[in-house]
């Protein structure tokens, strides 16, 4: 089940140009308690210069940014310019964040990590069906 808890900081309030796919990351925060709620609090505080649409842990999935808005999760166009997949999905000189939904998996040490993966698969399936990807 997805719970919507939209952030007001670290959110550009800019519409995606076109939804072309989903990018899955992990938070790289393995500390105890680094679940989706902890990341919601982190990204809704000071300016972090990054964000994602969804945070998934072993118990919940939080949506922080609407699917049709930009989140800062992929990096910028210059850093990713040499990736072959980039030229297929992102126009030259544009930013990949304008085209992808970002999902962050919370793989903290006290999480059931198999459950995190299962919840992520469920979310991706729902999003692919919803957006006909």
Which residues make up each language-model segment?
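Active-site-adjacent loop/helix surface patches within enzyme catalytic domains
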Residues: 1-133
